[in-house]
A protein has these predicted regions:
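Loop-to-helix junctions at membrane interfaces in multi-pass transport proteins
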Residues: 129, 133, 161-164, 169, ...
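Select transmembrane alpha-helical segments in multipass membrane proteins
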Residues: 22-27, 63-71, 143-161, 203-206, ...
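Membrane-interface loop-to-helix entry segments
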Residues: 24-31, 36-48, 170-177, 199-247, ...
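Residue-level detector of conserved catalytic or cofactor/ligand-binding positions
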Residues: 292-302
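Juxtamembrane inter-helical linkers in multi-pass membrane proteins
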Residues: 46-57, 122-140, 258-264, 276, ...
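Helix-loop-helix module between adjacent transmembrane segments
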Residues: 28, 32-33, 73, 102-127, ...
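Membrane-interfacial loop-to-helix junctions in multi-pass transporters
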Residues: 17-21, 54-63, 93-94, 142-150, ...
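N-terminal alpha-helical transmembrane segments of multi-pass membrane transport
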Residues: 1-78, 88-95, 106, 246
Length: 302
């Protein structure tokens, strides 16, 4: 059953992240970057300012810093570490180049998503702020496109349940725990006809309980928990990355050369150069979108 599920997910992944969608997403980012006159460069200082200066006043249920931490919580670690490693394994070092490209132009896309989410957000009867793609599709494009908003909601739920919304994070956590405590899978338990390492089961239960305790508190509790955990995650992640870079400075130029050569298939044989470049683009841009853009446009309105 597990192998069948993996095959289905792989087929869906290959279909969705085909070249047409890759080109559409990349050129959308380029178009928005041009129309916004390089927003990600012109307002970099302002963006960094709001990283270190919190705004408690204004509309919404959480502070600006809380919104930032909530947005980053879904990408730091799983997206940046697991996502990058997966992209390199699947597409080679060249995938990193396309990740950088997708991340740069994706900043403009992310800004546009956030702006639309805030512009078309609504206040529910209980006082909570609601917003996201399904709201700005319906309100921005008109009542005739309400079906598209519902379709987005359905597929978004499926992605959240069976894709990057839960599977990636939980798999990353449980795999790390299992590799530390029981890498040889000596201690196992049978569940639903499959054998699982006890450490994986225990880690899964703990993650479920902790996530449940946070989620039942609503967006305010999610924001408060993110404000505590995410800064530690970010500082640790950036610190470790800098340590690795500075302890391997002599290898940095060669690494950049390898990334560029692999990105354009320059090291591949003539017949496979286009194929190597295509794989690097697909894996790099897909993981770049996950690790840099995330899904914060749903949380932005609050």
């Amino acid at each position: 059953m597990l192998n069948t599920l993996n095959d289905v997910l792989n087929n869906v992944d290959n279909f969705i992240w085909g070249m047409p969608l890759i080109i559409l997403i990349l050129f959308t980012g380029i178009l928005l970057t041009v129309r916004l006159r390089g927003l990600q460069i012109r307002h970099l200082g302002k963006a960094l300012h709001y990283v270190f200066h919190n705004e408690d006043d204004g509309e919404g249920e959480v502070t600006s810093f809380g919104a930032l931490c909530t947005a980053l919580s879904a990408t730091i670690g799983t997206g940046n570490i697991v996502g990058c490693a997966t992209a390199i394994v699947a597409g080679g070092p060249g995938a990193l180049f396309w990740m950088w490209l997708a991340a740069f132009f994706g900043m403009a896309t992310k800004y546009a998503e956030g702006m639309l989410a805030v512009k078309y957000r609504v206040i529910a009867e209980d006082g909570h702020t609601l917003g996201g793609p399904f709201y700005y599709i319906e309100k921005g494009m008109g009542k005739n496109f309400k079906w598209l908003a519902k379709l987005f909601c359905v597929f978004g739920t499926m992605v959240g349940l069976f894709g990057i919304g839960t599977f990636t994070q939980v798999n990353g956590i449980t795999s790390a725990v299992n590799n530390f405590f029981d890498p040889s899978n000596v201690h196992t338990i049978s569940l639903f006809g499959m054998n699982y390492s006890i450490s994986v089961v225990v880690a899964g239960i703990i993650v479920t309980i902790c996530a449940g305790l946070v989620i039942i508190g609503g967006i305010k509790r999610i924001s408060k928990v993110s404000e505590v955990i995410v800064p530690f995650m970010a500082v640790t992640y950036i610190g470790v990355c800098l340590i690795i870079v500075f302890t391997h400075l002599p290898q940095v130029p060669a690494a950049f050369a390898e990334i560029v050569q692999s990105a354009f298939g320059l090291k591949a044989v003539a017949g496979g150069a286009i194929g190597a470049m295509t794989v690097a683009m697909q894996k790099g841009i897909a993981r770049g979108i996950f690790s840099k853009i995330g899904r914060a446009h749903v949380r932005t309105p609050v």
